[in-house]
């Protein structure tokens, strides 16, 4: 009986100690770029891959003489349709970065907590996955559909947060 009571007390004490342990602090990633820099450095070049694939067959690009240093995704070591796939995944991952608190180019906080911002980031992520699937499909119709969804996702957010009256003062 004493043994059973000792075991029960040890378990209760262990639970009490575990329950009182402080939660590990949530660490926010360090931010280096404002929203404009993030967009221009990541989404702009990656979206141009799918927009180029609308008018030029990714498989028709000739590999660059120095593929490992080519700045053109289509002629690089990971060119052709793989460039379309990679741009889709890069944009989907970048969508996560658009939710990290940071500054707009005008110094104001980016609206990352706004419901519409979050909704449009989800739309961007979904469109980016569509770009990835278009690269896998290697099909012009799928590319056109993916490019349209991506352009629409960008337009929704840009209409409110980029192309605004008052210029840079009011934009993110």
Tell me what each language-model feature is.
Residues 20-149, 163-172:
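Extracytoplasmic c-type cytochrome modules immediately beyond a signal peptide or single-pass transmembrane anchor
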Residues 150-161:
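The canonical Cys-X-X-Cys-His
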Residues 3-16:
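Bacterial N-terminal signal peptides
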